[in-house]
């Protein structure tokens, strides 16, 4: 399959009880004035461009190398002077390296900084979206790896984003050293 407008915004999360749950927002644009755009984050390497050094597991014998995750940091849907941005699961990763050994508070702050930069007006403009201000975040889903970190994670998110509705869940996240991952949605204007 060829992804002509980039990969989707996505989050891959573990579960505590097995099984699979899929939540999909799909858009079929028949209106030529609607644009679907990739939003990269210069603070983080695109997941689909990760080096072999950070990819987990063994290489499939049928492939020349390990395959990368196929998602964008965010996708924006833009029409004329407004739109939405879908923020993929974001963690305390700079470049392609995890922030290790700093605890839940610092990982949460770094994750929020990554998201704030991702949806900043300057970054949106750099991505081809003529937004006049930062995206207004309207919801978060917060994935916390360890129960003992849940309250601290809530406190940091609430202090940084006091009026933002958020759902918190206890579940595994993308790398063993990471303690939190956050996805969200924002309004663009």
Protein language model features and the residues they cover:
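N-terminal presequence-like segments and the immediate start of the first folded domain
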Residues: 1-189
């Amino acid at each position: 399959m060829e992804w002509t407008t980039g990969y989707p915004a996505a989050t891959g999360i573990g579960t505590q009880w097995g099984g699979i749950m899929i939540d999909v927002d799909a858009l079929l644009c028949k209106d030529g004035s609607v644009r679907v755009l990739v939003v990269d984050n210069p603070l983080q390497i695109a997941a689909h461009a990760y080096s072999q050094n950070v990819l987990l597991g063994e290489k499939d014998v049928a492939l020349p190398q390990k395959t990368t995750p196929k998602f964008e940091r965010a996708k924006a849907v833009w029409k004329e002077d407004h739109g939405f941005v879908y923020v993929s699961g974001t963690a305390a990763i700079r470049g392609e390296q995890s922030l290790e050994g700093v605890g839940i508070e610092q990982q949460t702050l770094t994750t929020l900084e990554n998201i704030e930069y991702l949806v900043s007006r300057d970054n949106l403009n750099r991505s081809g979206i003529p937004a006049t201000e930062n995206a207004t975040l309207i919801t978060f889903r917060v994935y916390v790896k360890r129960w003992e970190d849940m309250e601290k994670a809530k406190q940091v998110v609430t202090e940084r984003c006091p009026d933002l509705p958020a759902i918190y869940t206890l579940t595994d996240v993308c790398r063993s050293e990471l303690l939190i991952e956050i996805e969200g949605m924002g309004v663009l204007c």
